[in-house]
Amino acid sequence: VQFLGVLLLATITIGLPVYWLYEPERQANATEGFENRFASWGSQLFDVTANGGFNCAGCHGGMNATGGAAEYTVTDSKTGQVKAVSWKAPALNTVFYRFSEDEVRFILEYGRPFSPMSPWGVRGGGPMNDQQINNLIYYLKSIQVPRENCIVADADPLNCDGGHLPASVQDDIQAAAERSVDDGTYSSIGEALFNLELGSGAYSCARCHTPGWSWGEPGETGAGAFGWNLTGGATNSHFATEQEMIDFIKAGSVYGAKYGVQGQGSGRMPGFGSTLTDDQIREIVNYVRSEL
């Protein structure tokens, strides 16, 4: 009996520390396993209808969500005329550069009114429960463009804090803007970036702030659509200085948080500080404040 007691004591004394030594790794591996499974289930939901999915891929540019188009009908508010259009569906492989997880969840649950983006969560009247929305979010996280210069050097570049688009992608954005100036489409880099079509408008301002831009029939630039009207010096009234406006565009709006002059965030305005360079944002601000 004494021997068994000593053996048990030795097992506890030696075994438990050894067990706890490996416990953090075990938990980390278990968490990674759950996340991978959730992402896999999310991919099935994201897939095209023919494969049993909800056709997110069909609109947003395939399983990597690089940007696509959705068939939609729009009604002219003045004439009542109805017509079919092809609506630019933005790339989602940078969506977490622009929005927080809570903001992405809100968009998935409630959709974007007056656009092809329907509500998908049961809270918004859609077909997906909370777990399915979570699975979609895990899948979207798994296809993000890897970030450069994360705050923590060895963090997962798909979902790390801080960081920005790879320099090569930012160079592509700049090159696309410069081409549209060189060919005479736009008169300045700021105007070109404001209207940038790369990624089906994922990096542009006009997608939300110019009526009709999303289906190729833009009205007055910056006159307001899903985003508010920027014309007539509106931004100069809302932001006392150029730097205030730059800081707002970099961070985006935060639900309930104040910004500018008597502004309160809705969470709908994405942050562009991780996708565009400081110089690119400054070009946009100069264009909006001086030309709209």
Predicted region positions:
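Hydrophobic membrane-insertion alpha-helices, especially the h-region
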Residues: 3-19
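Electrostatic cytochrome c docking/interface patches
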Residues: 22-50, 67, 157-201
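Extracytoplasmic/periplasmic mature domains of Sec-exported, cell-envelope-associated bacterial proteins
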Residues: 37, 52-53, 63, 70-73, ...
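Inter-heme linker and motif-flanking segments adjacent to c-type heme-binding CXXCH motifs
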Residues: 65-69, 125, 142-152, 185-192, ...
